[in-house]
């Protein structure tokens, strides 16, 4: 069934004012289609290169996902090739998680989401104005099994949820949950953790980046847990889905070695309360039309002080979420079982994730507003099991921020800022253009024909109003600041998490490269949410960026302004096979002197695109 394009994603009639530090070249005339053919490599399907620009676009895209097998033994000094580290730059470390290895020595290529975790650390000494770079693989159980340290060779044995092994065991391979610790990184109470969507985090020694071992976040300090309210639990009794869950648990945990709970790689920090917020869901939730979520809150010493459990009668796939002062917020990315895909997955002919497909049966998107504390904080005793419905069909990818304000008349207003895409575009198997048969990535999956780009990830603002009795008076979605270019990785000054923010930053595509108009991203965007202004900083030709990260100059207690700081972002200069750490003055984005410094990583340590990062002050 062909679904309509969500009307809120259509380009605004009047574009917001945009300030660039340079004027991009005009867009090429509309093309009938964007077709990036895969060259004849002898590894899979073939195609015809129409011109050099198409060929270079294909090569550039592959270059972002080239394995880096080298690790640093000692921190490597990196020097600026442009500008210098500013005198007021705080001392600390920018950690970046992501995959490092995609291809083994036996013919298999894995999906980027299944690539072994490769932690990168840029330490900046603000006093000496010097920087060092360190990079090491997270020594997970999967890495120990698949890597031979004597011969320094790799053989993939774990399938992973998103991959098919071309040179390994396919049929009957139950090694699905391949914890590669490659998604995000957390530092809390002196502990550095690498996270993955589906298993326990791995603890890392923050100086050397040596792996300490697995770390059970949920049970840490459990003896001090004080669950202040049990009204969130469904005590209605055992039903058919509970019975199904009981039957699935020994299969998933015994045969497929899945942990009982799937730890989400996205966490939140409540700066006002100085709490770490995490969420897990049950392993069997992937196969049942019911979802169980456990939210945990930890104090500054990593002691578990509160848990809240919610059972929701919907089949959902959650990657990111949001919180406000008194609520947790979940976008219901709805999925369903795919019988045909399940058979293909069990036979090893498609990734295990093909057992699921998106469920676009509803034209609206449910949003669950879950109480963080006791009922006195709920809106008129509102039943949290009833979601708020937003009229557009959104698949939420990443949450930037959410906050709530209480009006004099008793209304509660909630705003959510996030990146979201259409159900018509999102595809578990084809993310990043993964093709296990050709051992190449197809850029056209991420770069749609003109007109279809509205289906790609964009930044949106969801605004809702609940009255004093908990009824939803309104729920609207619109492009953030009217911005309609493909964008993702929304971030803010973390001191403003969970409360009203004025600024947001993200990675985006300028659309100036005709062969790769939508992805990879080549811009950092700054949104002024009060004035509705948009300012951008763009890379040079054949250079791309990942997730930006805000680095504050001072703490909130010292009178910090929200944008008083810097943006650090990795620039992937594929044309010269180099990576750079770029430091931008957050206040000057959109001006010609936004770049404060560009630090060069040695060529032999050039690394593939990372996922999510963290700034940790010394």
Curated annotation (Swiss-Prot):
Keywords: Chloroplast, Dioxygenase, Iron, Metal-binding, Oxidoreductase, Plastid, Transit peptide
GO BP term, example: carotene catabolic process
Classification via InterPro entries: Carotenoid_Oase (IPR004294)
Transit peptide interval: 1-31
Pfam family name, one: RPE65
Superkingdom per UniProt: Eukaryota
Swiss-Prot/TrEMBL cofactor(s): Fe(2+)
EC number per UniProt: 1.13.11.68
Note on cofactor: Binds 1 Fe(2+) ion per subunit.
Enzyme class name: oxidoreductase
Region (Disordered): 11-34
Tissue: Expressed in flowers, siliques, inflorescence stems, petiole, leaves and roots.
Transmembrane segments: none
Catalysis: reaction(s): 9-cis-beta-carotene + O2 = 9-cis-10'-apo-beta-carotenal + beta-ionone
Phenotype upon loss of function: Increased shoot branching.
Gene Ontology molecular function, alphabetical: 9-cis-beta-carotene 9',10'-cleavage oxygenase activity; metal ion binding; oxidoreductase activity, acting on single donors with incorporation of molecular oxygen, incorporation of two atoms of oxygen
Keyword Cell division set for record: no
Keyword presence, Oxidoreductase: yes
Residues involved in Fe cation binding: 266, 319, 398, 612
Intracellular or extracellular location(s): Plastid, Chloroplast
Any one Gene Ontology cellular component term annotated for this protein: chloroplast
Role this protein plays: Involved in strigolactones biosynthesis by cleaving asymmetrically a variety of linear and cyclic carotenoids at the 9-10 double bond. Produces one C(13) beta-ionone and the C(27) 10'-apo-beta-carotenal. Strigolactones are hormones that inhibit tillering and shoot branching through the MAX-dependent pathway, contribute to the regulation of shoot architectural response to phosphate-limiting conditions and function as rhizosphere signal that stimulates hyphal branching of arbuscular mycorrhizal fungi and trigger seed germination of root parasitic weeds.
Similarity field: Belongs to the carotenoid oxygenase family.
Additional observations: The branching phenotypes of the max1, ccd7/max3 and ccd8/max4 mutants can be rescued by exogenous treatment with the synthetic strigolactone analogs GR24 and 4BD.
The protein, known as: Carotenoid cleavage dioxygenase 7, chloroplastic
Source species: Arabidopsis thaliana (Mouse-ear cress)
Biological classification of the source: Eukaryota, Viridiplantae, Streptophyta, Embryophyta, Tracheophyta
Name of the gene this protein is made from: CCD7
